[in-house]
Regions:
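Sec/SRP-type N-terminal targeting helices
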Residues: 130-131, 147-148, 193-221, 271, ...
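Structural signature of outer-membrane beta-barrel domains
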Residues: 161-165, 304, 377-381
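Short flexible linkers and secondary-structure junctions
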Residues: 56-227, 369-374, 404-414, 421
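Terminal intrinsically disordered/low-complexity segments used for targeting and assembly
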Residues: 49-124, 183, 207, 291-340, ...
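Glycine-centered motif in EGF-like
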Residues: 31-32
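Bacterial N-terminal signal peptides
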Residues: 39-53
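A short glycine-centered flexible hinge/capping loop motif at secondary-structure junctions
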Residues: 263-267, 474-478, 515-519
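Periplasmic alpha-helical coiled-coil/stalk elements that build and connect Gram-negative outer-membrane
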Residues: 199, 215-334, 445, 449, ...
């Protein structure tokens, strides 16, 4: 490499035969622009950091809005709710604010392999959940963007200019050339020390919003899994109804054959045959109607799992006959735990925290804006002498500006931020109230459905006995076929009601799990 040589006889505009100045050994001994900028920033940054260490951010520090949770749920006094044994592969565990362990898959407490398989597809395939994930990732990136304001901004530039001045202008000097060149390379640094905490409050708000977004994602995940389980049990309940209607159709076909044989034997009537045929076709129509509802639930399940509906089907399996399926007991815990277990409550609380940070941002506008700047580089009329000591230049500066009059704008923005916080705090308390109401509804619903199911089963037994007696009486010629039809219709209605109650118990059980937050707790929020 040829060294750059400088002749004292040559002026700044004299061109020398030299390599690119960036390759000059002198440039690298000087450290180039990075070292110049480092020197510029170090002294000012050290002073600013020393001052920042003792500065607290303006605005109120956040504390969670208060809420007095009851000691126990009202409806738990009327039912026994105990934790079930954990199923193989992990099960739903009662959450605790101090327990940050990842919970198992709560739907496994129902011990249904088909349901487990469908639920597992949600995390990998559901586009709604993917949308929520991307929303959270965008909010997390906003935190990184806000944190970047803690650091200086650095920029660099280079310029080359060839200019001719007017010989008749004020800058003309007789005897000197009117044409000259100007070459420059420089770097700039700018830093806003966070004396008043505006940046810290901005990061605080961004972090709280990101946590709220993460809680939203968890809430969507919980809702999708709960909807999948509820739809699945509805479908299995319809399978049970279809199985019942199938057996009823067979029974009614036998009854129709009996009435026809009795008519042929001269001991029956055409009215009996017509009534039997009417009852048979009515039940067949009911079976078709239930099949339509089943198809709709199958479509809903396939949509949640993001499956092609043309290739998707769920095998027929009546609810009461599904292997291993049993209604589990769901651990409820105490109301104070609900504040940590429901993601929608956590999301509302984090938005209140973000709104509180916005107050500090608004208050910081009442304080001066302070900015530290530095520039360093080289400038020369000769590219050959550009990267040399005499060509170096630098500047350091500090700027402070204070807004003296804004017609009350800052006061209005601060008041608006305070009202926004109060609104978010109220929304947080409202979410808690709705959550407690939801839990109480689900607990009472399960208890009442259990009682109703027991009563309905007695009604089914009585209706079955009535039908058996009426059928025997008809076969013995003691009564008309109308009595048999009435008893059979009553039996079928009670049997369908019993199936519906069983289905609703499973759906309500899922609703209770959902109202309790599933296996989630606030310790799973990103920090």
């Amino acid at each position: 490499m040829r060294e750059l040589r400088h002749s004292s006889k040559s002026g700044a505009g004299h061109h020398t035969n030299a390599p690119c100045p960036i390759h000059s050994p002198f440039f690298w001994r000087m450290g180039g622009i990075p070292r110049i900028l480092t020197g510029i920033c170090s002294s000012t940054a050290l002073l600013a950091l020393t001052l920042l260490a003792g500065c607290k951010p303006v605005g109120p520090n956040y504390s969670r809005p208060g809420y007095d949770a009851p000691a126990a749920y009202k409806e738990t006094g009327a039912t026994t709710v105990v934790p079930p044994p954990a199923p193989a592969g992990g099960g739903w565990q009662p959450a605790s604010p101090s327990d940050g362990m990842l919970r198992g898959k709560w739907w496994e407490i129902y011990q249904d392999p088909q349901l487990n398989q469908l639920e597992d597809r949600i995390a990998a395939e559901n586009p709604t959940l993917r949308q929520a994930l991307e929303t959270y990732l965008a909010a997390r990136d906003q935190v990184s963007a806000a944190r970047a304001a803690f650091y200086p901004t650095l920029s660099a530039g280079a310029s080359a200019t060839r200019e001719e001045i007017s010989a008749n202008g004020p800058n003309y000097s007789p005897g000197k050339s009117t044409t000259y060149s100007d070459f420059a390379v420089s770097g700039q640094a700018s830093w806003e020390p966070d004396f008043w905490g505006r940046i810290r409050r901005t990061v605080e708000a961004a972090r709280s919003n990101a946590q709220a977004s993460a809680a939203d994602q968890a809430n969507i995940d919980l809702s999708l899994h709960a909807e999948m389980a509820a739809d699945y049990f509805q479908l299995r309940g319809l399978d049970a109804e279809i199985a019942l209607l199938n057996s009823t159709v067979i029974d009614l076909e036998n009854q129709l054959d009996l009435t026809q044989r009795r008519l042929s034997g001269g001991i029956g009537t055409e009215a009996d045959v017509a009534q039997a045929r009417t009852q048979l076709e009515t039940v067949r129509a009911q079976r078709v109607d239930v099949g339509v509802a089943r198809a709709q639930y199958e479509h809903a399940i396939g949509t949640i799992a993001n499956l092609k509906l043309s290739d998707f089907s769920i095998p027929f399996s009546p609810l009461a006959q599904t292997a291993g399926l049993a209604l589990p007991k769901v651990p409820v815990g105490v109301p104070s735990q609900l504040l940590e277990r429901r993601p929608d409550i956590a999301a509302a609380e984090r938005r209140a925290a973000a709104a509180n940070a916005q107050i500090g941002i608004a208050v910081s506008a009442f304080y001066p804006n302070i900015n530290l700047t530095g520039t360093g580089g080289f400038e020369s009329m000769n590219v050959g002498t550009l990267i040399q000591g005499p060509s170096a230049l630098w500047s350091l500066g500090a700027q402070a500006t204070e807004l003296l009059f804004d017609a009350g704008q800052r006061h209005a923005l601060t008041d608006a931020a305070r009202h926004t916080y109060e609104a978010q705090a109220a929304a947080y308390r409202s979410t808690i109230l709705s959550a407690f109401n939801d839990v109480e509804d689900q607990i009472s619903g399960l208890r009442i459905l259990e009682q109703e199911s027991a009563v309905e089963q007695r009604a089914v037994d009585a209706a079955q006995n009535s039908y058996d007696i009426s059928n025997q009486r008809y076969k013995g010629g003691v009564t008309s076929y109308l009595e048999v039809l009435t008893a059979e219709a009553t039996l079928l209605q009670n049997q369908r009601t019993a199936i519906d109650l069983q289905t609703r118990q499973f759906v309500s059980s899922v609703g209770l799990v959902r109202s309790l937050g599933g296996g989630w707790d606030a310790n799973q929020l990103p920090k």
